[in-house]
Amino acid sequence: TLHKLVDFDRINQGATRLSVGAVNVETGNMTWFDSDKTEIRADHIMASGALPPGFPAVEIDGAWFWDGGLVSNTPLQYVLDEQMPADDLCVFQVDLFSARGTVPSSVWTSEGRQKDIRFSSRTRFNTDMMRRLHKTREAARRLYAKLPPELKDDPDARALASGNADPRVTIAHLIYRQTRFENQNKDFEFSRRSMLDHWAAGRRDVERTLAHPDWAARHHTGERVNVFDLSA
């Protein structure tokens, strides 16, 4: 099916970079399949979405892989580490599991709620960590500029102030809000009705975000890192 729907030759031509993550079942380590470094094939895409227990592990070059969401469901850090230092970034970060929810009332709803927390918590953690890191780097550069000349040659001072200025990063955080009829099987329930509902919800959230006045004014803020959650 993927070969009918996806033009892998176009992906591997390099005009648009594609990176997908999967976790090695035997080592527990995250692996990145990056079109800038690897020829992307259908099995790479299948591995990146092989979330157990609904989907079996996928074998690639003798190793077995599951969905990378088991380690990092929104791998923002990989994008930031791989981008060019001077480039400003506009990131649309899609979170299919909401960190916010109600207290479970049964074993079944507990299963669904713990999936929400498990797969969404790293998203907010990574975003918050990135903002703190940007502020720390900027403070280090400002402090270095105030040092007297005899201290600017200190190796520790040069290390703190090294590198280019961090790029300006704008993140649109699109969070899926669960419907009332979903249950604990939502991570592997792919009926036609569910897919149509999910596609429609995604379109509404994107349109609502792009039309929001805060998004239109995003370039006027003084922060190097701006996170917008405007789809609620």
Predicted feature locations:
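Non-catalytic peripheral regions of patatin-like phospholipases
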Residues: T1, V23-R41, G62-A63, G69-A232
